[in-house]
Amino acid sequence: MGAHVWGPAFLRDELLPNFQLRGWSGDWYAGFPAMHFYMFLPYLAIVAVDLLLPYGVAFKLVAVAGVALMPAAAWFLARLSRWPFPLPALSAVAGFLFVFDFNFTIYGGNIASTLAGEFAFSIGLACTLVYLGLVYRAIEVNELRTLASVALAVVALCHLVTLIFAIAGTVLMVLAAGIHRIPKLLGVSKAWLLFSSFAVAEIVLWRLLDQPFATLMVALFFVLGLLCLEFRGAFRALTVGLLGGALSAFWVVPFYLRRDYLNDMGWEKLTELRENLFFPAELSGAGSRISITWLLALAGFGAVAGLFRWERSIIFLVALSSCLAIAFAQWPQDRIWNARLLPFWYLSLYLLAGWGFWYLFQAACSQLRAGRSAAPGTHKGRLVIYAAPIVALGIALAGTSLYLGTSPGGSYDADNDFRWGPLSVSAEDRNFVSGWAEWNFSGYENRAASETFNDLIQTMKKVGKDHGCGRALWEYDKDELGSYGTPMAPMLLPYWTEGCIGSMEGLYFESSQTVPFHFLMQSELSSSPSRPMRDLPYSSLNIPQGISHMKMSGVRYYLAYSDEAVSESKVFSEDLKVIAQSGPWTVFLVQDSSIVQGLAYEPLVSEGSFLGKRSWIDPAVNWFNDQSRWLIPIADDGPDGWSRVSVEEVDDLSSPLRFGNQSSRKLEPLKITEVSISNEVISFRVDEVGIPVVVKTSYFPNWSVSGADGPFRITPNWMVVIPSENKVELRYGRTSVENFGLIVTILGTLILVALKRHEKRRKVVVCSSKDTKV
């Protein structure tokens, strides 16, 4: 989580003073659209708390808010959904157990994922539970529609994956209401015949006949029938969804319409279905995991008993968990990782387990009443019922503290196993989140190598002052960087140097299509690179090619750590000049590296269509790795006078596309002066017009130019302009996409205010009517 402190600070210092919630930052990836593809609302909350508390404290409080409020959010869902007492309290216990679950660490929702940086997901999930409670009331009794719409907008502005869960939950809530109604309309026997026929038809079509389209059509027909049966509730849910979408449109619409410029990291689909869904303890890999047999048993009992009683809330939870399991198994290899669905699956199991515990407790109470020790309605009977959440909480606290190794009176043996009376937990199975939290929140200053990291920061501040501000590419070494607190520590160079020294690597890997080219460079310039992006043609340490790529990318400083990288870099003293030494780090100045540069050859325009995902990245990667192609860049668009080049398929899994070969016109040398670069404005002067100039800043459609034609995207992911005047200025700003989203939000806000006033008037009329009857 160490580098996440950059985001709220950038929002506070750069965006909000300019009345913006999104903008451009040159701090990472040679520039990227800040807050355009990453939800800003949790960051805005940090900025708000920072008005009263120190920044570090504000960050920590908001970061843990999602998991801290999860039990209350689960209680809120159950309470508003009118689950019988003591289910709201038991749901809070279920939420407590969910956040302490440590079978997954980066998927989102629990404490472990929050500590890995997924705190926006946790906040979004807690808000989703609140929203589902509100939308239940809106569907059922037409109350709280405006609040439900606002809650849905909040979910959207926290995390889009939780928004998908919220929408799916809303649809299933309406369908559950329809399913619950069928036995009353058709009778129990006919209802079961209908459900059985549907299930058999789906299984036969899907499994035996392998007809996915027919399977989908039958399911769609069944769903439409249920929606018609519950038309009033469906209409209310639709109005909530439309209004919530309108309120968040100022951010969601630009995200959606600019999605083609997202970077696809290629997270590999999880295919171990049985292990991930039911037996996580059998998964291989690092990290502690525990069996969830008890959870499956309780959830299964709750599901069976609830369906036998035809409990509407159980129908909803069973439908939700079933759809999540099927979606996890059938989700394609796509930008949205199927692992992101697992937290919702686990949460639905915990909520079902709360029902299962209650049914078991009811059975125990029935036995007591049969023995006349606690008759219904008596003081003893009420005490037994009220004891259910207390007993559940006691068991949850005892189990959680046992696995955390914090049980009162417990001790560690010689093997570092924790023992508490007759119970014990091995060191391998212990819950690690307490140690991780202490590591995360104790600060960089409390790390063993804090002096080394601080010296590096001070060195780079001085380098910026003496040699000028610019981008830095640092060698990756997990162990060395991890000793500073996190391998992401140098990402904060722009944070500590007030934007003077940018870092080529940052967070938000999906936010810029420059990311793959950075990791290709990192692999060339590191002895132990990270290589987090899949399906790229990485090379091992290759300093000469790395130097060329740094110059191609406008990198000003190279920070080398390993003996191999340092010694090889010193061989190329004409290109890399040693300017500073900081502990184990050698700082090189990359000679003749500029961000604005005239081109030697006229660009070629690709004839390919770039419709998102890797349609641009794959051929651009092939160009990036082929030194013979570097002199002639490829653009995605350009004037009619530029020659065209095709996109060809090649037999290479990592880069299956490449640009064709084509000659180009040599250009006259160009003199560029008065270069000025800030976050959202780049300006320069040229001595000749009509000669293309490359600006080595990540391309994004929100850039516009005055005094030139363009900008067009050019390989690998920069901008090219054709000056029509001697003075050229590029500016990042709003476009029609952002304006459209903002207009929709303004209209949605006006509708929200009108609906709220209408609800108030209706309440007044109802109250007056009741008074008249009295």
Language model segments and positions:
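Extracytoplasmic/secreted cell-surface and envelope-processing proteins
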Residues: F165-A166, F255, L481-G485, V566-V571, ...
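Membrane-embedded transmembrane-helix bundle of lipid-linked glycan/lipid transferases
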Residues: M1-W439, G443, D455, T459-C469, ...
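A mature extracytoplasmic/lumenal domain signature
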Residues: T162, Y476-K478, S562-E564, D592, ...
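Extracytoplasmic/lumenal acceptor-recognition loop(s) of multi-pass membrane glycoenzymes
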Residues: L152, C323-L324, A396-R447, K461-K551, ...
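Active-site-proximal, structured, solvent-exposed surfaces of multi-pass membrane proteins
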Residues: S643-S768
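Short, hydrophobic beta-strand segments that form beta-sheet elements in well-ordered domains
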Residues: L473, R556-Y561, V693, R713
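Short acidic, glycine/proline-enriched helix-loop-strand junctions
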Residues: A565-S593
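Solvent-exposed loop/turn segments at secondary-structure junctions
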Residues: F100, V161, K478-G482, Y558, ...
